[in-house]
Curated annotation (Swiss-Prot):
This is E3 ubiquitin-protein ligase RNF135. Residues 241-432 form the B30.2/SPRY domain. Residues 95-121 are annotated as: Disordered. Its main location: cytoplasm. GO terms for biological process: antiviral innate immune response; free ubiquitin chain polymerization; innate immune response; positive regulation of interferon-beta production; protein homooligomerization; protein K63-linked ubiquitination; protein polyubiquitination; protein ubiquitination. Changing R286H: Found in an individual with overgrowth, learning disability and dysmorphic features; uncertain significance. It catalyses: S-ubiquitinyl-[E2 ubiquitin-conjugating enzyme]-L-cysteine + [acceptor protein]-L-lysine = [E2 ubiquitin-conjugating enzyme]-L-cysteine + N(6)-ubiquitinyl-[acceptor protein]-L-lysine. A zinc finger (RING-type) spans 21-63. Pfam families: SPRY (PF00622), zf-C3HC4_4 (PF15227). GO terms for cellular component: cytoplasm; cytoplasmic stress granule; cytosol; ribonucleoprotein complex.
Length: 432
């Protein structure tokens, strides 16, 4: 099979983050891919694991570990891409014409740069037009998929062999280019074919709605868009934090035991930042130059300053602006290279980007479902040795309850996904 010639090269837009290492925040250098699929600079991994002096070699991204240190091999494909990116970035920064200083393997970049450049305004119009056209095509494709799912839904009850075949057809349709990441985090949990079809239809309708909103927004005049943004909150189904207006709910029945924890800076990971009031923790865009301390977490975690050793305590955490998170409690002696819930002296509920809510207690995971709580209430009753987690968005719903030992003080504990800069958790003011 003949390969593509140089004239058939496909231009691909890459940002530095696409080929970056989350440990050093730079381009990959001698990239090594772990068994979980995540890649890092080899020397960054070795330095990180060496500093931790840990018994398990965990991935800094997904936290999967192994009993023995994995053999690090060079990912030559990633290395080649990173090298090409470096060369292109140097050419752009120097402002030189690549046609006069060709670089091996960068002929497609050189030929593109050697062409006469369009005026910026013409480039912008062409890009906006292509974005609108693509959005319209995606909208039509999703409408077609919605029709397919609805027709399946209206058919007679499926036979035992039917659901797998028909759902596999839908899977092939999705693989043609529709990105389900635009839909709300929702796991297909129904056991019946009808339930699965209903869930797929729900996700498709959400994608359809957002695509239509995107096309409408692109076609609106710029002045009109600015006026609407100033005069009214966004109509998007994913409003910004300061634009959201959650339904009013009654005061929590635990309000009389409410506390207002603040983050402890000594335990704060270098990949996190804390607000001035010490009640908001954010994933940083770059490693922070905090002073080294044996009390500081090597993973993106933080404890609060308040030690809870007796009595009853309640606090709430707003998780709506974080895609992956865990909230719970831990002892101060928790190992700083371990992850919340994976130790005997910590417990938490955790939301994964795979649309799964889990509880971790005594190093065991309990899957709770696929509904994502926007606000989590934590109830710690040390008099009875109980810990409970509630979803308290609009009404109170128990998520998980377990027994705990009060042999040592416990501290509110938090984990955030370190690969999503800008994600944050807020310790809320409990409604009294």
């Amino acid at each position: 099979m003949a390969g593509l010639g140089l004239g058939s090269a496909v231009p691909v837009w890459l940002a530095e983050d696409d080929l970056g290492c989350i440990i050093c925040q730079g381009l990959l250098d001698w990239p090594a891919t772990l068994p979980c699929g995540h890649s890092f600079c080899r020397h960054c991994l070795e330095a990180l694991w060496g500093a931790r002096d840990a018994r398990r070699w965990a991935c800094p991204t997904c936290r999967q570990g192994a009993a023995q240190q994995p053999h690090l091999r060079k990912n030559t494909l990633l290395q080649d891409l990173a090298d090409k990116y470096r060369r292109a970035a140097r050419e752009i920064q120097a402002g030189s014409d690549p046609a006069h200083c060709p670089c091996p393997g960068s002929s497609s970049l050189s030929s593109a740069a050697a062409r006469p450049r369009r005026r910026p305004e013409l480039q912008r119009v062409a890009v906006e037009k292509s974005i609108t056209e693509v959005a319209q095509e995606l909208t039509e494709l999703v409408e077609h998929l919605v029709d397919i799912v609805r027709s399946l839904q209206n058919q007679r009850p499926l036979s035992e062999s039917g659901p797998d075949n028909e759902l596999s057809i839908l899977g092939k349709a999705f693989s043609s280019g529709v990105d389900l990441s635009m839909a709300s985090p929702k796991l297909v949990t129904s056991d019946t074919a009808a339930g699965k079809i209903r869930d797929i239809l729900h996700d498709l309708e959400e994608i359809q709605e957002k695509l239509q909103e995107s096309v409408t927004w692109k076609e609106a005049p710029e002045a009109q868009m600015q006026g609407e943004l100033l005069e009214a909150p966004s109509s998007s189904s994913c409003p910004l934090p300061d634009q959201s207006h959650p339904a009013l709910r009654r005061a929590s029945r635990f309000a009389q035991w409410a506390i207002h924890p603040t983050f402890n800076l000594k335990s704060l990971s270098c990949s996190l930042e804390v607000s001035k009031d010490s009640r908001t923790v954010t994933v940083s865009h770059r490693p922070q130059p905090y002073r080294w301390s044996c009390e500081r977490f090597s993973t993106s975690q933080v404890l609060c300053s308040q030690a809870l050793s007796s009595g009853k305590h309640y606090w709430e955490v707003d998780t709506r602006n974080c895609s992956h998170w865990a909230v719970g409690v831990a002892s101060w002696e928790m190992s700083r290279d371990q992850v919340l819930g994976r130790t005997m002296d910590s417990c938490c509920v955790e939301w994964k980007g795979t649309s799964q809510l889990s509880a971790w207690h005594m190093v065991k995971e309990t899957v709770l479902g696929s509904d994502r709580p926007g606000v989590v209430g934590i109830w710690l009753n040390l008099e009875e040795g109980k810990l409970a987690f509630y979803s308290v968005d609009n009404q109170e719903k128990l998520l998980y309850e377990c027994t705990i030992s009060a042999s040592s003080p416990l501290y509110p504990a938090f984990w955030l996904y370190g690969l999503h800069p800008g994600n944050y958790l807020i310790i809320k003011q409990v409604k009294v």
